[in-house]
Amino acid sequence: MSSALLLAPGDLIEKAKRELEQRSIAPLLREKNSTEAKSKLKEDGEKKNKSEKEENKIHDDRRVESQESEGSGSADCQRGAGSRGADCATSTGGGDGGAGARTGIGGGGVGRVDSRSGGRGGQGAASDGKGVGKSKTGADRVANDGATRDVGTSEVSSSGITSGGLQGRGGLVAKSSECGGEPLDRTGGCSGNSKTEGEEAKVGGGDRRIGGLATQGIADFVKKKIGVEVQVFSKGMSNFFTVDKSLLKRGGLGREDILHQSDIVKEIRASDKKVKIIPLSTVKRMIAEFGGTEEDEIKAVQTQSSSIRYISNRMEDVSRAKAMFTAPTGDEGWKEVAKAATQRPNIMAYVHEGEGDGLKELLHLIDHI
């Protein structure tokens, strides 16, 4: 019996994976990149460029506003000098949070404050006496005994918070030593990770059912019965599956496997009650837990005399294909493969146009070629 190759759509091959494995047919699938991946990459690049342009425009607008505001403050300061005893002084902060402008009462006039931030978020206004200064943002600052607070804004002093600076218009970015330097969110917590320990466990797969059988001999017995490989139990698994003793005896397993299974059950009940013991009393129960097919059906499949040993949706396999099966599909590259295959004079082509996905018809074709 020769080894032949069958062409079929990729999504149909994926659906038939278990049945193909039972028939010892190897799938040869085209890599999922090409058109779909290139389209997504192009779309992501366009979005990134658009985002960068918008961000640059925002920065430019803010820089222009800042320059206009500084120029206006300087002009006002010059116009007010010398009238009614007004005194105007400007100071630029430097280093880490340098102090801002200082002002006092000159005669009967009230000084104007022009505060410029310097270093990493350094800004503020202070007064030797009692006075009212007006900042560029329009918020009134009340200075008294060297302590400064903002009136009508949401900026307040907080212990354990290092100065961050102003972001946008009045948006304070603060970092806390308790959060390991991560930014604080508006609820007062660390914005870097807001999940609880239980949520983290679920995300990490802690709630997934992981289990196994007592010995490799029992695992081989289960595979023979339902055609599914089940791993051997080890520490850290959350479930231990026990196969009924009568099933094991009828399957020809020795006394050693049965006793080892009993010993693990006793050990779990005595010391590790977190592990769940799940009994498998029948073959149908095994299928319910692990999937698969009953032994008689597996034997019937294995005795089928099909010459097909490979199934593919790749263009490079068209030249050596014996037959082609096609059906409505979501495989984007399949149209070109099918077109190339039909140009060969000696290839057998089968088309599914009825209801359903064509899986049953594909397997029927495989078993009769």
UniProtKB/Swiss-Prot annotation:
Molecular function per GO: structural molecule activity
Chain segments annotated as transmembrane: none
UniProt record similarity statement: Belongs to the orbivirus VP6 family.
Any single GO CC term annotated in Swiss-Prot or TrEMBL for this entry: viral intermediate capsid
Keywords: Capsid protein, Intermediate capsid protein, Virion
Name by which UniProt lists this protein: Protein VP6
Ranges annotated as biased composition (Basic and acidic residues): 29-66, 196-208
Predominant location: virion
Annotated segments matching region Disordered: 20-208
Stretches with biased composition (Gly residues): 92-111, 162-171
Pfam families: Orbi_VP6 (PF01516)
Cell compartments where the protein resides: Virion
Organism: African horse sickness virus 3 (AHSV-3)
